[in-house]
């Protein structure tokens, strides 16, 4: 047996070994040699055969799409999925979640494997070549898209200069914004991306930001760039003439101490880190340039070519001054509809003194809170997400819901009244003289209108959109392309026919049918905005919570010349309220309840219905015959042409009066200025709109413990019920990964 074993060993040694395939993977090391541990094998069900993807680490240079997809997958791994509109949870346990979906658990398993492969190493400091046209996977999933969004290398006293607060004061930059600044010089092929809060002042040549061109002036524009939204890319405008004496674009960047960065304290869970740290690398508070490696996942604001073409059509040669501009923007959800409408508004402000904005989206208002349709008049561009520029409306109506599904008739009546108010009261104005028009070189004879519609494009939503379009009679329609869907066209199935508007023939016997001579409506087809997986971190419900909390922490002003400020140093439960009396002959006289179930509230239950509720403060524009009582069960609110909504308020508490002074005393939290609050006469309350949970708690460090908050036990805290209910299946679902038995 020993001889046979020896011969077998000799034959095995002499036989050629199979060659190992040469790996095409070139490992990229950040610090020293990088050794990749072999990932654990996991049994997964593959629904469709897919080619094996390339290795994680490759030496090829990515394309732009591959680069963003890779960065987005990293963002999902690092940020996780958190919803501020959902109950908070600690670590991996959750006592408030009823269950997680299979998709969520699969994503968690995938992220665990990635962390095991990465070994929790930081690989952000790997640079990428500027050539983004070649194909192939990227070098590391941990790369930030900084080399794409910023093409600027600051050098002191060359293209970058620091300015002290005293030097700004000597240059007559006394606009109420303290702090130092920096002057940046951008070449024609350079761009700069900044995260945070800052004031932007163009000094030389025209620059572009958020699809908006800003010309040199002494005016400063507040810019809000949280990491929860696309970051603005500042670059020289493409319309700049190449033969100018100086091809450098100079801009001044200063601190913007508006107070909204107080979200770092934790006022809205999930949004505490969107403003990054207080001190920036340039020595400016809250200003974080994206130059070099960046500590958090970000993605830039991109302007598709179709957007640029549509915006460029607003030139002086194309806009007919005899027919006021009325632009309607429509498209599905998540298409960039509101973003483009905001860019359209900003570019119109380059030629017009004022621009009107009609908000038809109940879910996500641009200049106000949700559940309101309104008309806003602006004279300055809005450079930031919707929650950063709340404004007082010119005329608005409160529907008390985030969708017109439950009140389509009231929705159309409110929008019809707003369109009529614009046409008869705001479209043509003689407020400004010819001298003002000449000095500012802007048109002030009429006010253009931008209509932002809802993203509901099917069924009833399509019918509502068609009615709005027929009422507004827009001169320009900007339509976003809908994603193609497979429609079954078999027997018995039909699709919705395309909308077509036809004018009735003119009949002298019926003068009302005379056609109105209007310019042919121009339609622009727009492509959807670039999609990033970072957008999936926050749902529309999360953004509504953020908008509501920041709205009640804001301080609004009657004029847009005074910027909005926020005070988020303390929660709403610790904010000093306004005390207003409710009763006949008092400051607030009547209460109206709207929405489903409102007719069932009895008069004696009115304090219970109002306590802790969000209400709309409205003024009466005319006389209205109504019952001389504070509240009448089932009473309908006054007509829309007699009511104007000033804003929203939270009734923090109320107390009953006495025999000498009957009525109720309300403690209101509202961002309205005193001049607007004194005009309010009635309250409108809907049961579909409630204050989000972050507005009811003390979110400060140490403000909440197991016993309660604010020195009170949980049983003494109003509006909150923290008692859990133990039910079967109420705990979080978990998958067991150690069951590997055959036949199961």
Curated annotation (Swiss-Prot):
Its EC number is 2.7.1.-. Keywords: ATP-binding, Kinase, Nucleotide-binding, Nucleus, rRNA processing, Transferase. Pfam families: CLP1_P. It is found in: Nucleus, Nucleolus. Residues 1-131 are annotated as: Disordered. Residues 39-55 have a biased composition (Basic residues). ATP binds at residues 331-338. InterPro entries: Clp1/Grc3 (IPR045116), CLP1_P (IPR032319), P-loop_NTPase (IPR027417). Residues 61-82 have a biased composition (Polar residues). Belongs to the Clp1 family. NOL9/GRC3 subfamily. This is Polynucleotide 5'-hydroxyl-kinase GRC3. It comes from Cryptococcus neoformans var. neoformans serotype D (strain B-3501A). The lineage of its organism: Eukaryota, Fungi, Dikarya, Basidiomycota, Agaricomycotina.
């Amino acid at each position: 047996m020993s001889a046979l074993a020896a011969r077998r060993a000799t034959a095995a040694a002499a036989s050629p070994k199979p060659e190992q395939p040469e790996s095409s993977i070139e490992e990229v090391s950040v610090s020293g040699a990088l050794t990749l541990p072999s990932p654990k094998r996991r049994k997964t069900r593959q629904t469709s055969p897919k080619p094996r993807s390339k290795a994680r680490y490759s030496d090829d240079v990515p394309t732009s799409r591959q680069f963003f997809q890779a960065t987005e997958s990293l963002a999902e791994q690092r940020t996780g999925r958190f919803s501020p509109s959902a109950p908070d949870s600690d670590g991996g346990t959750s006592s408030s979640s009823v269950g997680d979906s299979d998709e969520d658990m699969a994503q968690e398993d995938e992220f665990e494997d990635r962390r095991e492969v990465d070994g929790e190493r930081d690989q952000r400091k790997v640079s990428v070549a500027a050539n983004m046209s070649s194909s192939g996977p990227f070098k590391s999933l941990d790369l930030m898209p900084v080399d794409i969004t910023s093409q600027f290398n600051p050098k002191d006293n060359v293209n970058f200069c620091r300015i002290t607060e005293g030097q700004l004061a000597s240059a007559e930059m006394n606009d109420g914004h303290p702090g130092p600044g920096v002057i940046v010089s951008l070449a024609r092929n350079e761009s700069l991306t900044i995260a945070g809060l800052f004031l932007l002042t163009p000094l030389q040549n025209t620059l572009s930001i958020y699809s908006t061109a800003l010309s040199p002036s002494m005016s400063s524009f507040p810019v809000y760039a949280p990491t929860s939204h696309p970051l603005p890319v500042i670059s020289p405008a493409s319309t700049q003439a190449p033969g100018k004496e100086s091809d450098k674009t100079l801009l001044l960047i200063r601190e913007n101490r508006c107070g909204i960065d107080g979200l770092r304290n934790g006022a809205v869970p999930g949004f505490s880190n969107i403003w990054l740290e207080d001190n920036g690398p340039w020595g400016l508070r809250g200003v974080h340039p994206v130059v070099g490696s960046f500590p958090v996942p970000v993605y830039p604001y991109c302007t598709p070519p179709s957007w640029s073409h549509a915006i460029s059509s607003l030139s002086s040669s194309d806009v007919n001054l005899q027919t006021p501009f009325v632009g309607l923007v429509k498209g599905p959800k998540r298409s960039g509809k509101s973003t483009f409408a905001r860019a359209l508004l900003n570019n119109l402000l380059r030629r017009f003194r004022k621009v009107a904005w009609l908000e038809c989206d109940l879910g996500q208002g641009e200049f106000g809170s949700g559940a309101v349709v309104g008309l806003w008049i602006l004279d300055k561009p809005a450079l930031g997400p919707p929650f950063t520029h709340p404004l007082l409306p010119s005329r608005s109506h409160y529907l008390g819901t985030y969708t017109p599904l439950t009140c389509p008739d009231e929705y159309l009546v409110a929008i019809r009244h707003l369109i009529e108010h614009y046409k008869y009261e705001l479209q043509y104005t003689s407020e400004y003289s010819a001298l003002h028009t000449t000095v500012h070189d802007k048109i002030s004879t009429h006010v253009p209108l931008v209509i932002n519609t809802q993203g509901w494009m099917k069924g009833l939503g399509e019918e509502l959109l068609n009615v709005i379009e027929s009422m507004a009679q827009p001169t320009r329609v900007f339509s976003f392309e809908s994603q193609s869907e497979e429609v079954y066209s078999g027997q018995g199935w039909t699709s919705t026919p395309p909308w077509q508007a036809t004018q009735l023939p003119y009949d002298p016997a019926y003068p009302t049918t005379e056609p109105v001579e209007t310019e042919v409506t121009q339609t622009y087809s727009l492509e959807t905005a670039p999609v990033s997986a970072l957008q999936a971190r926050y749902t529309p419900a999360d953004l509504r919570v953020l908008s509501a909390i920041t709205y009640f922490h804001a301080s609004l002003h009657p004029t847009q010349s005074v910027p909005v400020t926020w005070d988020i140093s303390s929660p709403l439960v610790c904010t000093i309220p306004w005390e207003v009396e409710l009763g006949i002959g008092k400051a607030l006289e009547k209460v109206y309840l709207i929405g489903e179930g409102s007719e069932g509230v009895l008069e004696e239950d009115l304090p219970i219905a109002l306590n802790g509720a969000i209400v709309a403060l409205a003024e009466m524009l005319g006389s209205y015959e109504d019952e001389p009582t504070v509240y009448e069960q089932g009473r309908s609110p006054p007509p829309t042409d007699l009511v104007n909504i000033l804003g929203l308020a939270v009734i923090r508490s109320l107390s009953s009066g006495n025999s000498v002074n009957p009525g109720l005393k309300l403690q209101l939290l509202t961002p309205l200025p005193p001049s607007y609050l004194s005009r309010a006469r009635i309250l409108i309350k809907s049961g579909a709109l409630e204050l989000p949970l972050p507005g009811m708690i003390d979110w400060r460090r140490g403000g909440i413990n197991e016993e309660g908050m604010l020195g009170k036990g949980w049983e003494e805290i109003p509006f909150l019920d923290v008692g859990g209910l133990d039910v079967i299946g109420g705990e979080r679902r978990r998958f067991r990964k150690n069951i590997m038995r055959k036949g199961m």
